[in-house]
Structure formats: C-alpha cells, structure tokens
UniProtKB/Swiss-Prot annotation:
It comes from Shewanella baltica (strain OS195). InterPro entries: HB_polyprenyltransferase-like, Prenyltransferase, UbiA_prenyltransferase, UbiA_prenylTrfase_CS, UbiA_sf. Pfam families: UbiA. The keyword Transferase applies. The gene is ubiA. This is 4-hydroxybenzoate octaprenyltransferase. Belongs to the UbiA prenyltransferase family. It catalyses: all-trans-octaprenyl diphosphate + 4-hydroxybenzoate = 4-hydroxy-3-(all-trans-octaprenyl)benzoate + diphosphate. Keywords: Cell inner membrane, Cell membrane, Magnesium, Membrane, Transferase, Transmembrane, Transmembrane helix, Ubiquinone biosynthesis. CDD domains: PT_UbiA_COQ2 (cd13959). It is found in: Cell inner membrane. It is an enzyme of class 2 (transferase). GO terms for cellular component: plasma membrane.
Length: 286
C-alpha cells in the first residue's frame, strides 16, 4: 500500500473526509467558550479546543469502528469502512487511536487541572460509547453525554469552574444530540435489526418522529435558558428562531422514514448548529 492509499484509508477511518461530525461537535464547544468568556475567548484556549475537537472526533471514529468491525460489513452504509473491509488491521487502528489520544491529552496539559480531570472522564466516555450499542436501546443518550463533554471542559478552561449556565448548554446539546443521532439511526434501522445493533430509532419505533420532536423542543428550551442566564439578546434570539426553522424542516424530511431523507435531516443539523453559533457570536459583537 503506497502513501496515497494509506492516507485514503486513514482519512476514511478517522472521517476526515466527512467533517459533519467534527462540525456538530465544534458548534456547541465554541458557544461554550464564548459564553464562558462573555465574548471572545482566550486565543490559546480557543486554538487548543478547536484542534482537540478534530482529534477527539477522529479518536471516536476509530474506537467506534473497532467495536463494530464484525458488524459493519452487514450494514449497507458501513460495509466499506476500513476495519470492516480489512483494509487496515485492528492493531494499526488501535495504535493510531493511542497516538491521537495522547496528542489530545498533551494539548489539555497546557490548561488547568480541572480541565485535565474532565478530559480523563471524556476519553473514558469516548471509549465506552461504541459498546453501549450492544447492551442498551439508548446508546444515543450516552452519545449525548460524550458529545456534550467539551462544554464543561470549555467553561473550566476559560473560567476555572463549571457554573449552572454551562449545564443548561450541556442539557441543550444532550437533547439535540439525541434528536439528530436518532435521525441518523433511522437510516440504518432495518440493517441494525438484522444484526442486533440497538438504537433509539428501534426503541422509539412508530413514535420516532414525535419523540425526536420532543427532544428538539427540550433542546430549544435549554438553549433559551442558557442564553437567558448569560443575558443574551435579540441576535441570539434570531439564531434560536433559525434553529427552530431547521428543526421543522428536519421533521418534514423524516416524515416518511426513508433512508436518504433521514440522512439529509441528520446533515441539516450542521446548519442548525451554525445558526446558533452565528447568532450568539453576533449578539456579542454587535
């Protein structure tokens, strides 16, 4: 395997070629940094968190594919993944995971002790998540914790503490993650039922759209509470309204529960997150 082929395998293993996950992690992290700083966060902290999000998303993808390597070949969307197709060995994948994980931890060591402690919890949660799909019908709820963990870390890095305001944002992102990852799980539901992978899309069954809607409403309420506790104004409110518009559009997309529209609804959440981030940023700047 030449260098170009190796890069292709690594980029697919870490999903560098598919940045949607990185972006969905990044928007709430950047919002947390802004809220904690009351505007523009410390540049050093900002750079560390952006790089850290990219690295930890890659780590999450590797450990997810390692856990699912014997099942991915039976699922239409995942059968071409490098571990499932045999393009890369499990040993090589785990070595890459360790290298990236240590790199991320090295960045965290540049910050305060509370952030370091929270980061240890974060990496443990990242490792545990893929295996929850074997034991519970609610892995998306565990993923919501994993994907929201950068929020208390961001507050800790910027202020040295994690105030109540941070937990409103944490709750908002948790609800939002459960909603959009259930849309994602709807894409694979038929295959997951065959191979025994558990998900909220299966758990919710015929009430999937309604329960996703409830999580979207809960996320909306908590995003509003987070903004309220930080005394945010009109422009953040416009971001919230745009988020509502995108959420409504997503409900329309998943109405018939077809694979392609459900996947499109999942991807659309990037724009919902961007709207919140831009609204918050504009509210501080203008």
């Amino acid at each position: 395997m030449n260098l170009k082929q190796k890069w292709d395998v690594y980029s697919r293993l870490t999903r560098i070629d598919r940045p949607i996950g990185t972006l969905l992690l990044l928007w709430p992290c950047l919002m947390a940094l802004m809220l904690a700083a009351g505007g523009m966060p410390d540049l050093k902290v900002l750079v560390i968190f952006i790089i850290g999000v990219v690295i930890m998303r890659a780590c999450g993808c590797i450990i997810n594919d390692y856990a699912d390597r014997d099942l991915d070949s039976f699922v239409e969307r995942t059968r071409s993944r490098p571990l499932a197709s045999g393009e890369i060995s499990t040993k090589e994948a785990l070595i890459l995971f360790v290298i990236l994980g240590l790199s991320a931890f090295g960045l965290v060591l540049l910050l305060n002790g509370l952030v370091v402690k929270l980061s240890v919890v974060g990496i443990i949660l990242t490792i545990i998540y893929p295996f929850t799909k074997r034991i519970t019908n609610m892995p998306q709820m565990f993923l919501g914790i994993v994907w929201s963990w950068s929020i208390p870390m961001a507050y800790a890095a910027q202020t040295g503490e994690v105030p109540m305001e941070a937990w409103w944002l944490f709750a908002a992102n948790w609800c939002w993650t459960v909603a959009y990852d259930t849309m994602y799980a709807m894409v694979d539901r038929d295959d997951d039922l065959k191979v025994g992978i558990k998900s909220t899309a299966i758990l919710f069954g015929k009430y999937d759209r309604q329960i996703i809607g409830l999580f979207q409403l809960a996320a909306l309420a908590c995003f509003i509470a987070a903004g309220w506790s930080a005394d945010r104004g009109l422009l953040y409110g416009l971001g919230i309204l745009t988020f509502v518009g995108f959420s409504t559009y997503q409900q329309m997309l998943i109405f018939d529960r077809e694979r392609a529209p459900c996947f499109k609804a999942f991807l659309n959440n990037n724009w919902a997150g961007l709207a919140l981030f831009v609204g918050l940023g504009a509210d501080y700047l203008i």
